[in-house]
Amino acid sequence: MQKRYLGKSGLEVSALGLGCMGLSHGYGPATDTRQAIELIRAAVERGVTFFDTAEVYGPYLNEEVVGEALKPFRDRVVIATKFGFTFGDDNKQQILNSRPEHIREAVEGSLRRLKTDVIDLLYQHRVDPDVPIEDVAGTVKDLIAEGKVKHFGLSEAGAQTIRRAHAVQPVTALQSEYSMWRREPEQEILPLLEELGIGFVPFSPLGKGFLTGAIKPGTTFGKDDYRSTVPRFAAQAIEANEKLVTLLGKLAAEKGVTSAQIALAWLLAQKPWIVPIPGTTKLNRLEENLAAADIVLSQKDTQQITEALETIKIVGERYSPEHQARVGR
C-alpha cells in the first residue's frame, strides 16, 4: 500500500484508510464483534495503517472494537478518533459539547476504550458554536504537550474556523464529506488546506454506498440506518442521481475496474495529501477498495472525468435539516 503525508504535518498514513463507523453505527445493526475485529485486522495485513473511529459511534462501541482489533499492531497504525458530544440517558440523543473539561473527559474515555496511551489524531467531530474554537484548539494543544494526543484535526468545519484553530494549534487534517457527488470542498476548503499545509480526509468517498451502484430507486432503509432520514436517499433523488451511477459504470468499464475503484482513484488524483477512508463490513469490498490505490489516472483522465461530472446536477441534501445545521460552521 502506498503512503501519503497529511499535509505538512509529517503524519504518514496509508493512501487509503479504513472508516470503521459502519461496523457499529449508522447503517443498521452492528456487525458481530469478532467479524468486525477480523475485518480490521485483514486491513492491517493488506497494508492499511490509518483507522478512523469516534466516541459517538455506538456510542463508545466502535472505539472498543477498534482498540481490541488494533492492540497487537499498535506501533504500526495511526488511530484517529473524535470528541464533541454528550449523550442523553438513552445514549441516543447527541448534544454538542466541546467545553475544555469535556474534551479532557472524552479523551480519557477514548484512551481507555482504544487500549492505548496516546491518540494519534484527535478531531473535533462538529464545531460547537457555544465554545470558541480557540478554547478547543488550546485544550488539544495542552493535551499534545501532556503526551495524550499527537495531532489535532477538525471535521466538517468552515474556512474561518479552520484558520482560527490553526493559529492556536496547527491542524493536521480536516475530515469532511468529499466524493463525486459532494464536491463543495473544491470551492473554498481545498485551496485553504493547500495554503495552510493541512491534510484532507474525505469520509463517505463512495457516497454512503450510492456510487457503487448497489442502491436503486426501490431500495429501502431500516429505521436504524441513518440514510432513511437523508433527502438524497429518497426514492425520487436516487432516481434523479442515477445519471452519476451510469457515468461511473461507463468510466469503470473503459478502465476495466469497478465503479467504486474509479470513484476512489479520482479522489486520490485530486491532491497528494488527500486520504479517503471508505468503510465496509465485507472482506471482498475491502480488497476492491484497496486496489483503487494502484489505479493511475492521468491528468487527462482526471480532467475528462471532472468535465463529465460537471454535466450532472446532484439532487437532494446530504443530511437531514438537523444535521445539516451542524456543518460548515
What is each model feature region?
Residues 22-27, 86-93, 285-288:
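A short acidic, helix-capping loop that chelates divalent metal ions and anchors anionic groups
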Residues 127-307, 311-312, 322-329:
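Beta/alpha (TIM)-barrel catalytic core signal, keyed to glycine-rich beta->alpha loops juxtaposed to Asp/Glu
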Residues 1-78:
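N-terminal binding-site loop/beta-alpha segment at the start of enzyme catalytic domains
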